[in-house]
Curated annotation (Swiss-Prot):
<feature type="active site" description="Proton donor/acceptor">
    <location>
        <position position="41"/>
    </location>
</feature>
<protein>
    <recommendedName>
        <fullName>Probable 2-dehydro-3-deoxy-6-phosphogalactonate aldolase</fullName>
        <ecNumber>4.1.2.21</ecNumber>
    </recommendedName>
</protein>
<feature type="binding site">
    <location>
        <position position="181"/>
    </location>
    <ligand>
        <name>2-dehydro-3-deoxy-6-phospho-D-galactonate</name>
    </ligand>
</feature>
<keyword id="KW-0119">Carbohydrate metabolism</keyword>
<dbReference type="InterPro" id="IPR000887">
    <property type="entry name" value="Aldlse_KDPG_KHG"/>
</dbReference>
<dbReference type="InterPro" id="IPR031338">
    <property type="entry name" value="KDPG/KHG_AS_2"/>
</dbReference>
<feature type="site" description="Orients the nucleophilic substrate">
    <location>
        <position position="18"/>
    </location>
</feature>
<feature type="binding site">
    <location>
        <position position="18"/>
    </location>
    <ligand>
        <name>2-dehydro-3-deoxy-6-phospho-D-galactonate</name>
    </ligand>
</feature>
<keyword id="KW-0456">Lyase</keyword>
<feature type="binding site">
    <location>
        <position position="70"/>
    </location>
    <ligand>
        <name>2-dehydro-3-deoxy-6-phospho-D-galactonate</name>
    </ligand>
</feature>
<comment type="pathway">
    <text>Carbohydrate acid metabolism; D-galactonate degradation; D-glyceraldehyde 3-phosphate and pyruvate from D-galactonate: step 3/3.</text>
</comment>
<feature type="active site" description="Schiff-base intermediate with substrate">
    <location>
        <position position="130"/>
    </location>
</feature>
<dbReference type="Pfam" id="PF01081">
    <property type="entry name" value="Aldolase"/>
</dbReference>
<feature type="binding site">
    <location>
        <position position="160"/>
    </location>
    <ligand>
        <name>2-dehydro-3-deoxy-6-phospho-D-galactonate</name>
    </ligand>
</feature>
<dbReference type="InterPro" id="IPR013785">
    <property type="entry name" value="Aldolase_TIM"/>
</dbReference>
<dbReference type="GO" id="GO:0034194">
    <property type="term" value="P:D-galactonate catabolic process"/>
</dbReference>
<feature type="binding site" description="covalent">
    <location>
        <position position="130"/>
    </location>
    <ligand>
        <name>2-dehydro-3-deoxy-6-phospho-D-galactonate</name>
    </ligand>
</feature>
Length: 212
């Protein structure tokens, strides 16, 4: 199956809003978009996640990538398509889930930790790979695994990543990240999220500004 590529993004950062409630979605998502985030993931173990995703899809401008994380089944992929999601992130490698999401036109980012998982995800047509948890693998672990992967496959570091270690990953050529608790924790106000987003993007630009 042909791989659906990640769309061009000035900053390839995915905001992970685990625990977001539907009534908070408009304010929090709006704050992220206003500050410059263009990819947003709402994990399916959040309260009533598809309502939040639908809200985000409806309010996001063209070019924003909105979707779900913790996608485990093909039924969840179908539901995600129904609400207009275009991003499918999973914690594991399930070829049937990846392939169905691709047929729905979604960008797919399965989670991997080993060379076997990474190659299986690539064979299933994943748009990119989510190396998780990046805090355990570290830059050296990701470098070792990346050596055996297709060169055109996008790699994102997720889990334990924040503005304090962007430079560590920049040193090995990684510029895509999924940002969770360093950016958003359940119950945070839209104003607090906006301030965290501003600080995060400033730190990213300080490291990667010359590479964009």
């Amino acid at each position: 199956m042909d791989r659906i590529p990640l769309p061009p993004m000035e900053r390839p950062l995915i905001a992970i809003l685990r625990g977001l409630k539907p009534e908070e979605a408009e304010g929090v998502v709006g704050a992220l978009i206003e500050t410059g985030f263009t990819a947003i993931e709402i994990p399916l173990n959040s309260p009533d996640p598809f309502r939040s995703i639908e809200t985000a899809v409806k309010m996001a401008p063209a070019g924003c990538l909105i979707g779900a994380g913790t996608v485990l089944t093909t039924a969840q992929v179908e539901r995600l398509a129904d609400v207009g999601g275009r991003l499918m992130v999973s914690p594991n490698v399930e070829p049937a889930v990846i392939r169905l999401a691709a047929t729905k036109g979604m960008v797919t980012m399965p989670g991997v930790f080993t060379p076997t998982e990474a190659l299986a995800a690539a064979a299933a047509g994943a748009s990119g790979l989510k190396f998780f948890p990046a805090s355990v693998l570290g830059p050296s672990g990701i470098t070792a695994i990346r050596a055996v992967l297709p060169g055109d496959l996008e790699i994102a570091a997720v889990g334990g990543v924040s503005e304090v270690n962007f430079a560590d990953y920049a040193a090995i050529g990684i510029r895509s990240f999924g940002l969770g608790s360093s950016l958003y924790k359940p119950g945070m106000s839209a104003g607090d999220v906006r301030q965290r987003a501003i600080a995060t993007l400033a730190a990213y630009d300080a490291v990667y500004g010359g590479q964009q």
